[in-house]
Amino acid sequence: NEAINHEMIEYCPAASEAVACSIAAGLKMAGKKPIVIIQSSGLTNMGSCITSFLKPYGVTFPILTSWRTYKEGDSEIQHKHLASELPKLINAYGYKYHFLDSQNIDNAINQINNSDKTHTICIIKKDSFDKVNLKTKHQLLLLLKATMLLLGC
């Protein structure tokens, strides 16, 4: 929410992680500086884009993923597997990974900048950030954009 609230950042919601990956690749090739931020379960949705487009053609941009942990009774069973195997999945895609520094913001920014030049995914550990509420004006804008996407506009 902090990034969405920031006036200097243009937030672009996507229907899926694979779509976000494709949009970011296009932006990168157009000379922009995209960042894709996803939940760990969404990394599986990006697999084909990563292995058939980004990696073979050398397209790089920062990808940040949470590391969602599995809890007994979780409604989505894939979280159990990803809770223990996320680094292996990243390596299987031909990427490296590192854990985003949650103690030193300058180091975290350097890690993100470095992942813009390499096939590296930054893993964000649970509770790395403070909770930030989304500003009301952005809540309405996101609702409008989501509605337009659903209607095919």
What are these regions (language model features)?
Residues 1-153:
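Thiamine diphosphate
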